[in-house]
Amino acid sequence: LVKTGISYVSEKGAAENLKAELSGWNFEQVRLDAKAAWNKSLSVFQFESKDSIAKQQFYTALYHTQIAPSLFNDVSGEYRGADGKIHKNNGFTPYTIFSLWDTYRAAHPLYTLTDENVADYANSMLAIQQQQGTMPVWHLAGNETGTMVGYHSIPVVVDAYLKGFKISEDKVWDAIKGFKDYNDLGLRDNRNQDYISAEKEPWSVAKGIEYAIDSYSIAKFAQKTD
């Protein structure tokens, strides 16, 4: 058997994580614990059907929604921020893997019904904004890939705020101001001429539609906090 510790901070952090999470060598116990943990996590829904295939498809899809976001800090509370510096979790638990164009429509609204970590997800995005100057677009392991259409951390955070999760109103406004000043990915043209030129930007129509959704979420937040 081989055990591996993972840390985005240090080798010491990886060793401490491994010791805290898996100190023994009982493979069968680890398997049983993992099975029990997944059964508990998937039990947020009770799906009743005589169609066994439909039931399998439902719980497989639910399982897929729970693969990410992923916990990002060491057991010490340290994590590597979007600025490359080591930070300590302060009032929230940091997460990563925010594939937001894929998840903002359905997965994140689902999390507000089923996932106790929603505030941590939102506060992780707000911390990323403070560290790199912009909200995440497609954030992976402390790094911004910038490979998705839209600026969909905004509607995710606004949705969580409007549903009563513990999120700083001031930090949400800071994030919105960052969106207003962000000029990449066609946003400058979208702001200045109300459309995105296909000659200048790929996926121009898709981006225009997605930015309209982002702007609508900003309007809803403003109505709530005005």
Which residue stretches match the model-derived regions?
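Conserved active-site and cofactor/substrate-binding residues in soluble primary-metabolism enzymes
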Residues: 13, 29, 33-36, 56, ...
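Acidic/polar, glycine-enriched structural segments that form the non-catalytic walls/loops
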Residues: 1-95, 127, 134-137, 166, ...
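Active-site cavity-forming subdomains of large catalytic enzyme subunits
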Residues: 117-124, 129-225
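Long, structured ligand/cofactor-binding scaffold of large enzymes
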Residues: 83-84, 92-100, 104-105, 111, ...
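Alpha-helical support elements that line or immediately flank enzyme active sites
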Residues: 60-73, 96-119, 155-165, 215-225
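Hydrophobic alpha-helical scaffolding
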Residues: 24-28, 48-52, 96, 112, ...
